[in-house]
């Protein structure tokens, strides 16, 4: 808890058994709620999460990264979180930054905080492939122009949100795939939320989840499409539910089936 606000960490996960425990062990004591949503993994991610004392939800099918986030945010809001921090279970980002990111939200200055791999040159130092770094810089410059803000990157998966933002954004209008992250930032800009950044080191290694070249290209086209719809909606050329107040929201209309696993009687000794 920070400034009287309850902090939740949500972890969208798929086949994260090898890295999950390291991720959970680094979570700070300021975290009041720990939630993992397993997107129908083929390994023991869900069982290990339960053993570690994390509230665990399991999808009945592999719905994708974006849909996984929708479940994460619904369950965090239902649990009474005031601030929600998304941490990937693959240990690519350090959970040690959770208190700093949550504090930036708790101060009332920001509604969304992004952990940037670009600030401080953490991306290349951590092993980001050169083609991904190039795409990151090109797409970021493109979106800074058309979204009218200046961020160091739009593509990090480590981020924090206020409750108000998660309740107001029409997240159910977004993709079930990786471009969900980018769509969420564009929505936050459209709705007038304040976005801050913090420098974050990153690690690229075998067990860390990462999309391949083909999926990266698909993601890039998704970013361009999202930006085009943002501009068209803002100029009133089209009306996009993803950028309108009447769009579907996770707190009101979420529908994906996710089974919650019961926790062990004593998670420390399970």
Where in the sequence are the language-model features?
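Short beta-strand-to-loop acidic/aromatic patch adjacent to the donor-nucleotide binding site
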Residues: 81-90
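A conserved acidic beta->alpha catalytic loop
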Residues: 38-46
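Donor nucleotide-sugar binding loop of glycosyltransferases
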Residues: 16-19, 41, 94
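Hydrophobic helical membrane-anchoring modules
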Residues: 1-3, 148, 172-270
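Acceptor/aglycone-binding surface of glycosyltransferases and processive sugar-polymer synthases
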Residues: 59-78, 95-178, 205-214, 221-224
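Short hydrophobic beta-strand elements that form part
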Residues: 8-12, 35, 58
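A short, conserved beta-strand element in the Rossmann-like catalytic core
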Residues: 40, 64, 92
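Short, well-formed alpha-helical segments that are part of the catalytic scaffolds
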Residues: 12-29
């Amino acid at each position: 808890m920070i400034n009287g606000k309850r902090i939740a960490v949500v972890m969208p996960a798929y086949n994260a058994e090898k890295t999950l425990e390291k991720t959970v062990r680094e979570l700070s004591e300021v975290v009041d709620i720990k939630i993992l949503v397993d997107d129908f993994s083929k390994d023991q991610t869900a069982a290990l999460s339960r053993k570690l004392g994390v509230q665990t939800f399991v999808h009945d099918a592999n719905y994708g990264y974006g849909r996984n986030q929708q479940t994460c945010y619904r369950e965090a809001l239902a649990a009474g979180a005031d601030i929600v921090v998304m941490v990937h279970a693959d240990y690519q980002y350090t959970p040690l930054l959770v208190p700093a990111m949550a504090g930036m939200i708790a101060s009332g200055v920001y509604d969304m905080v992004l952990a940037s791999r670009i600030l401080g040159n953490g991306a290349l130092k951590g092993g980001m492939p050169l083609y991904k770094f190039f795409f990151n810089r090109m797409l970021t410059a493109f979106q800074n122009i058309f979204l009218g803000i200046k961020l160091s990157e739009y593509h990090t998966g480590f981020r924090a949100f206020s409750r108000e933002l998660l309740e107001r954004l029409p997240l159910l209008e977004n993709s079930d795939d990786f471009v969900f992250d980018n769509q969420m930032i564009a929505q936050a800009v459209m709705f007038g939320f304040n976005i801050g950044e913090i420098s974050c080191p990153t690690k690229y290694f075998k067990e860390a989840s990462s999309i391949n070249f083909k999926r990266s290209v698909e993601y890039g086209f998704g970013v361009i499409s999202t930006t085009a719809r943002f501009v068209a909606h803002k100029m009133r050329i089209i009306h996009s539910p993803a950028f309108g107040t009447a769009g579907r929201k996770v707190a009101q209309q979420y529908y994906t089936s996710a089974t919650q696993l019961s926790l062990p009687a004593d998670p420390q000794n399970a």
